Regions:
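Rhodanese-like catalytic fold shared by cysteine-dependent sulfurtransferases
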Residues: 1-36, 41-77, 83-123
Length: 123
């Protein structure tokens, strides 16, 4: 299904304020030993079908409510991903507004991660 114009405009606006990295750049940082908290912002059903190895789950619907309890360190490097990079961009914008300083949205999201053959797990 094609994304609605209003949604795409919200994402475009959010992307002006956030940092994005490609799937490959995120993997390079992980391989280099950078301390990264990888957060899957997809819906529960999407998470259950499989997710990036090492990721934690804070769905887009609850991330703003729960992130401070799950990741209290607002200086932590937090990489958010969703299906393709749109919802995670919106979430990254909100999380930054909450005072987190090192928030990154992974461009390409789950689709890019799996297409690159990177490690996944299924709960």
């Amino acid at each position: 299904m094609a994304h609605a114009e209003g949604f795409l405009n919200l994402v475009k606006d959010a992307k002006k304020r956030i940092k994005e990295l490609s799937v490959q750049d995120v993997k390079k940082r992980i391989d280099a030993g950078d301390k990264i908290i990888l957060v899957d912002t997809r819906e529960d059903v999407e998470w259950a079908r499989g997710h990036a190895a090492g990721a934690i789950h804070l769905g887009k619907g609850v991330i703003e409510r729960d992130i401070e309890n799950v990741i209290p360190d607002k200086e932590a490097t937090v990489v958010l991903y969703c299906g393709g990079g749109f919802r995670s961009a919106l979430a990254a914008d909100n999380v930054q507004r909450m005072g987190y300083h090192n928030v990154i949205s992974m461009d390409g999201g789950w689709k890019g991660w799996t297409e690159a053959g990177l490690p996944t797990i299924k709960d």
